[in-house]
C-alpha cells in the first residue's frame, strides 16, 4: 500500500510511535452527516503514555463542512478543518460532522499510541487534557503550525 498511497506514507512518517489504525472517512455532499455520538470503543483513549490518540487530517474538504464537539461542561465548539491540517480529537466527548457543501469530504483518520514525541507536536492547549477528569474545555485541538499542524499535502 505504501507505493500506491505515497501521501499516506508521508503523513504517517511524521508520527514517531506505533500506529494503531488508519482509515479514510468520507461524508457525502449535500447534507452528509455523522450524527452526534461518542466513541467508547477503547477505554485507553487519551494523551497519556501508551494510550491511543485520534488524529484527523483533512485530505479533501470544503468551507461548508462543520465539525462540532462538546466539552464535559456542555460548551460547544465548531471547527472548519482545512485541507492538509492535522487535528487531535478527544473522541470520548460528544462530536458530530456535517457536509453542507457540494464536494465530498475525505479525512485520513489515524489512531496513534501517545508518547512524548506525539505530545510535543500538540499546541499548548493540550495540557488540560493530561488529566481527563479535569477536562472542561473544547475537544478539538488544532495542532501547532510549527510542529505537526502544517500543510502536508
Show which residues each predicted segment covers.
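Amphipathic repeat-derived elements
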Residues: 1, 152-153
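Catalytic core of Fe(II)/2-oxoglutarate
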Residues: 64-151
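Catalytic core of non-heme Fe(II) oxygenases with the double-stranded beta-helix
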Residues: 8-86
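A structured, charge-rich N-terminal accessory region that forms the first stable segment of a protein
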Residues: 1-9
Amino acid at each position: 500500500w505504501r507505493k500506491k498511497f505515497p501521501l499516506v506514507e508521508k503523513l504517517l512518517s511524521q508520527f514517531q510511535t506505533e500506529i494503531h489504525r488508519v482509515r479514510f472517512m468520507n461524508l457525502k455532499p449535500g447534507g452528509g452527516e455523522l450524527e452526534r455520538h461518542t466513541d467508547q470503543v477503547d477505554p485507553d483513549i487519551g494523551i497519556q503514555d501508551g494510550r491511543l490518540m485520534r488524529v484527523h487530517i483533512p485530505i479533501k474538504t470544503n468551507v461548508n463542512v462543520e465539525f462540532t464537539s462538546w466539552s464535559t461542561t456542555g460548551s460547544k465548539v465548531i471547527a472548519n478543518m482545512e485541507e492538509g491540517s492535522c487535528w487531535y480529537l478527544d473522541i470520548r466527548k460528544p462530536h458530530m460532522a456535517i457536509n453542507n457543501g457540494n464536494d465530498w469530504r475525505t479525512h485520513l483518520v489515524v489512531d496513534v499510541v501517545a508518547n512524548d514525541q506525539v505530545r510535543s507536536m500538540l499546541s499548548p492547549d493540550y495540557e488540560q487534557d493530561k488529566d481527563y477528569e479535569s477536562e472542561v474545555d473544547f475537544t478539538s485541538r488544532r495542532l501547532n503550525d510549527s510542529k505537526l499542524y502544517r500543510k502536508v499535502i
